[in-house]
Amino acid sequence: MSIEILGMVGTKDFSETHGSFVDGPPIDVPYLATFARAHEAAGFDRVLIGYGSSSPDGFAVAASVLHATERLRVLIAHRPGFVAPTVVARKLATLDQLTGGGRVAIHHITGGDEADQRRDGDFLDHGGRYRRTGEFMSVLRRTLTSAEPFDHEGEFYRFEGAYSSVRADIPLYFGGASPAAVQTGAEHADVYMLWGEPLAETAERIRRVRQEAVRHGREITFSLSTRPIVAATEAEAWERAERIRAATAGRVSGGGLGWSKGKSESTSVGAARLQEQGAEREVHDERLWYGVTNLIGPGGNSTAVVGTAEQVAEALLKYHDLGVTTFLIRGFDPVDDVVRWGDELVPLLRQGAERREPAGVGA
């Protein structure tokens, strides 16, 4: 069965191991174009454009990426609550049609850091944010697909005669690990995004989301986000992991990352679970490495899969066996890793997926 392979682009050269989040211009246009084209040349299907309360606007960045490439698709991270879903629907559909159709998707991030929420003026509590996200996704989908005006009155939004003359088939991605997130994503998302956790925990999360989706008469697909660390031999891959750990540790202690462990006001259930798993042991399932996770504290996608290209592909395909059909992979050396993966890892993932069928598909 075919899979979808996602990367992630940034507007400047920065990762846990090098560059600066806070120093220098926030947007390097030539770098962004090079980064996007590297993904396209390496055979990626789509790239995620992240969201933060102090980051460049994702819709504008997406337009730049789409302009710089011919086939590469984008996944725009968006935090519901600040722009009406009817407006977001028109923005998405317009961008999609202007770039040939079928190249735009949206990833709903409800928000798990109270300080980051407040920077944009959001003081809603955790449960309220997920209720708002669910209502947002419902209105968004209806606006994208309805050929007739409609009215809506809910807890957070009220519209009379809502209608968009420009419509598109925009996939709705979603992420979250709390019970409220499971309820919201299972009811509204097309793709449920998961962080890289051990196989047993991932299988249980997929089971829970599918069970909730059945209650709504829906089927849902799954994405897994990890940070591959690949080298010619397994020993060299683990040596590279140690170099990444050392570089990250030095930057955390010196403040070079622009954030530091303990300063987050995270309410993210998923981030807390990653911290617990990393504290339990540093390596799970032979290759899932928490070395960076343990250093940077609550945050985003930080668990790595370490080994040769063949070993990493096989480790990721074990998640495919559980039902994962989308993989989001990003590196610690962002552009160079993408180029290397295009030579080996991406083809190996596609070839391996064609030879196996994920759980819950084709039954």
Regions found by a protein language model. Give the residues of each.
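A structural motif
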Residues: 41-44, 101, 189-190, 324
